[in-house]
């Protein structure tokens, strides 16, 4: 089987990147030929196809990448295309960034009148909304991987995607690297390093966008 994984840019801290890196190893062990299609990527160059068309600005950047990827997919004999970007030429989409339409709705709820107007006129948001609609309306789309029930419900509410296409698969965790027994090893030293009293309540938010 020949599988393409699509991600525009590599980030050392990205959840999608962790997902792809784990998939590359696991699928490779099963004899699946995996190709990463990306603008930039860190890894074995033999498994990466670079799509890096010229662009100015974020609308042109995302539109140009999506167009280049779909051209690449059309000329290569992939059995499946799994994308982490909003492109209409994929078989499986991982909705790791949630639903942009819902994010905008939540954002508008906390903004003032002028800021809401600016949000609505922003060309990038308008592009992403259009790309999102094309993705979920695509007859090629077979399945959507949702990393939470909330995302699943939002996709169903905004786009009417059939329940059978929506699959909740939570992010994997390395239970050796993240295990309660390691608390005794790292907790006191890390609190001391950050200047946090040993008994002070501490809330940690893991993710981006905070």
Model regions: which residues?
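Conserved donor-binding/catalytic core segment of Leloir-type glycosyltransferases
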Residues: 197-210
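A short helix/loop element that forms part of the nucleotide-sugar donor recognition site in Leloir-type
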Residues: 179-196
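Short His-centered aromatic/hydrophobic patch
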Residues: 83-87, 95-97
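Glycosyltransferase donor-binding loop in the core domain
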Residues: 11, 173, 207-210
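An amphipathic, basic-hydrophobic alpha-helix
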Residues: 55-81, 90, 125-134
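N-terminal strand-loop element at the rim of the active site
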Residues: 7-13, 26-60, 72, 165
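Carbohydrate-associated surface elements
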Residues: 150, 172
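Membrane-proximal helix-turn-helix segments that form the acceptor-binding/catalytic region
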Residues: 121-147
